[in-house]
Amino acid sequence: MAIKIGITGGIGSGKSVVSRLLEIMGIPVYISDIEAKRITHTNDVIRRELCALVGQDVFLNGELNRPLLASYIFGSPEHAKKVNAVIHPQVKEDFRRWVKGKGDIAMVGMESAILLEAGFKQEVDFVVMVYAPLEVRVERAIRRDYSSRELIMKRIEAQMSDEVKRNHADFVIVNDDETPLIPQVLKFISLLSKNNHYLCSAKK
């Protein structure tokens, strides 16, 4: 059975960079954000339950009405919880099918900014947190998203703190533009490949 690696971190930490490195090394990575958007369009359970929650107009001509869904989600914290309760279980099921479809592969990854918040931690064996200092993250996100510092800070403040993520992580990768990244990834993979008993499973 494949070892499942959860990759998480805050906005601008560089999760996608680590995921790409793993894929280059032959370890496929399930990008939960992309896959969640896909199955929201295609999964009958999600479509039915979102229609029940938000109304039939949440899908127009077969396409997700994103402005309406966003308006519903941001209208109340309870609304966001209800939408997540519809989508997240289906993402978990999709991830399990995806892993099965990979056959006898040694390792797979799951990238998710909300790995811990969404309960995806229970789907993986080990959690890797990608860490970068706050200022580095803010500058990266501003450049990437063409956004303002104020908006980026609001998004960061809405996320789980780095301290909490670190407490749940089995391994922390520092991506601060100074510490070499590849040796850290290689070290982590080597530990899992040869001596995975040195790390505590995320499920324990």
Swiss-Prot record:
<keyword id="KW-0808">Transferase</keyword>
<comment type="function">
    <text>Catalyzes the phosphorylation of the 3'-hydroxyl group of dephosphocoenzyme A to form coenzyme A.</text>
</comment>
<dbReference type="InterPro" id="IPR001977">
    <property type="entry name" value="Depp_CoAkinase"/>
</dbReference>
<feature type="binding site">
    <location>
        <begin position="12"/>
        <end position="17"/>
    </location>
    <ligand>
        <name>ATP</name>
    </ligand>
</feature>
<protein>
    <recommendedName>
        <fullName>Dephospho-CoA kinase</fullName>
        <ecNumber>2.7.1.24</ecNumber>
    </recommendedName>
</protein>
<feature type="domain" description="DPCK">
    <location>
        <begin position="4"/>
        <end position="203"/>
    </location>
</feature>
<keyword id="KW-0547">Nucleotide-binding</keyword>
<dbReference type="GO" id="GO:0005524">
    <property type="term" value="F:ATP binding"/>
</dbReference>
<dbReference type="Pfam" id="PF01121">
    <property type="entry name" value="CoaE"/>
</dbReference>
<dbReference type="InterPro" id="IPR027417">
    <property type="entry name" value="P-loop_NTPase"/>
</dbReference>
<keyword id="KW-0963">Cytoplasm</keyword>
<keyword id="KW-0418">Kinase</keyword>
<dbReference type="GO" id="GO:0015937">
    <property type="term" value="P:coenzyme A biosynthetic process"/>
</dbReference>
<keyword id="KW-0173">Coenzyme A biosynthesis</keyword>
<keyword id="KW-0067">ATP-binding</keyword>
<comment type="similarity">
    <text>Belongs to the CoaE family.</text>
</comment>
<dbReference type="GO" id="GO:0004140">
    <property type="term" value="F:dephospho-CoA kinase activity"/>
</dbReference>
<comment type="pathway">
    <text>Cofactor biosynthesis; coenzyme A biosynthesis; CoA from (R)-pantothenate: step 5/5.</text>
</comment>
<dbReference type="GO" id="GO:0005737">
    <property type="term" value="C:cytoplasm"/>
</dbReference>
